[in-house]
Every structure is written in C-alpha cells, then in structure tokens.
C-alpha cells in the first residue's frame, strides 16, 4: 500500500476552515479535506489560560505533498502560531491510498 499522510489544523471559524480545505484540494495538495464540527480548546497563550471555539480540518495527502501543503496552510492560516500536525496512516484501504496519490499529482 502506498503511504498516506494526514495533516490536521484548527481555525477560529467555519468559513476559514472551508477556505483552507477548498484551497488545498483545488491546488492538488490534498486529495480530501474534512472540516469537523466545533470543538472547545483550552490552552496557554501569553501567560494565561485561554478557551476558544475552533473547527478542525483534516487533510489526506501523499507524503511527497506534505511540505507544500504545510507551507500553504502556514501562509494562509489566521493564527500567529498555528497548530499543524502531520501523521502517517500505517494501514488502510489500498484502493483509497492509490486514489489519494492519483488526486495529489500536479
């Protein structure tokens, strides 16, 4: 099976999440992007504990497209220090993995 990478981030509005998802797929940096429902995050920021509502975005991509995808997310993300996490799927449907690779070719 070809490898798949999953890139995740969170943003402060559904509309921003939708824009990030659409741009990544349109640019063939991700085969699929899923915008998750609202979650509440609690974190340290500037010496204080903050809580805010955020929307998650999960991108499925080929490993050789990860750096370009991360660069695009960083360039358009509204946060000063955006959460961008990359993980690799260890196993899964080989047909889906092949589809991800096919859809992320420039």
Predicted regions and their residues:
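Positively charged, small/polar-rich N-terminal and surface patches that mediate targeting and assembly
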Residues: 1-106
